[in-house]
Amino acid sequence: MTARAIRRCHEKDALMLKPLKPFLPWMLLLAMGLGWGLAFSLAKMAILAGGMPFGMAFWQMVAACVMCFVICQIQRKPIPMTRQAIANYLLVSVLASSVPSSCLMFAAGRVPAGVIAITIAIVPMLTYALATSMGREHQSLIRLSGLFCGIIAILLLVVPSTSLPDRSAVPWILVAAIAPTFHAFNNINLTRPVMAGMHPLHIIFGANLFGAMTLLPLSLASGHMFPLAFPFGVLEWALFGNAVINILAFVGFITTIQLAGPIFASQTGYIVTISGVIWGMVLF
């Protein structure tokens, strides 16, 4: 196929998708929410199947890294390794990969999947708070009211003695809440000019690469490392499923930020909360 024919195909595809463009951010928001909501239940399955937190996070990142590398090679998209690109990978790795994944894995074995999903509602609240404090969004009384209502809702989840079946889970809810806090900072980070020109698959590859490099010694030192079984069992399929979800959802998330901004994209946290609770009820 000639270059002109390929260009015509792209133009034809663009024309076919044009009527859907106004709805695309909403469609992505729903898809991300359903996918990330399932991720908590998959993490719970992996823990129940014998996985250990640091080891689970490590293998999940390795799987995501390998898949992104293969896709980039097939699409002939060379992965940049400049000083600025590496700095971007490291920052996203800390904010969206190694720290959040480890926190969620630790909490998954001690807190119901639905409860962990509820903590994700923190993401849009904190994203809005950060954006307004940095002057990127105008203050709104309605949005501020929503922010305070969200904070009260989280407090109602952990403070009353009857809110949880086991009060020993309270500290682990706070550990789980570290993940959405870091994700909120990453939402703002992804809007920086130095991030704008990077392909989502490159960002995912780099973040998971450096995340896996960080978690490898931690997994070995803590005794959390474990070999993968072949053929795959529940543990391996759960980790592989989470890796696929994270790749697809992160690509959709960056696309949504580019189309509608970080505040809109962060609203997927509410869908994650609802779908996470439903997935937890269905699967457990």
Regions found by a protein language model. Give the residues of each.
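C-terminal-most transmembrane helix of multi-pass membrane proteins
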Residues: 17-20, 27, 61, 142, ...
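Specific transmembrane alpha-helical segments of multi-pass solute transporters/efflux pumps
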Residues: 35-40, 69-120, 156, 242-260
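Helix-helix packing/entry segments at the starts of transmembrane helices
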Residues: 56-59, 97, 101, 114-122, ...
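Glycine-/small-residue-enriched transmembrane alpha-helix faces in small-molecule transporters
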Residues: 10-58, 106, 165-192, 213, ...
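Cytoplasmic-side transmembrane-helix entry/capping segments in multi-pass membrane proteins
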Residues: 29, 84-92, 139-151, 172, ...
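Transmembrane alpha-helices of multi-pass small-molecule transport proteins
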Residues: 48-99, 126-127, 182-186, 204-224, ...
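Hydrophobic transmembrane alpha-helices of multi-pass small-molecule transport proteins
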Residues: 68, 139-161, 215, 270, ...
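Membrane-interface helix termini and inter-helical loops of multi-pass transporters
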Residues: 41-50, 109, 158-169, 220-237
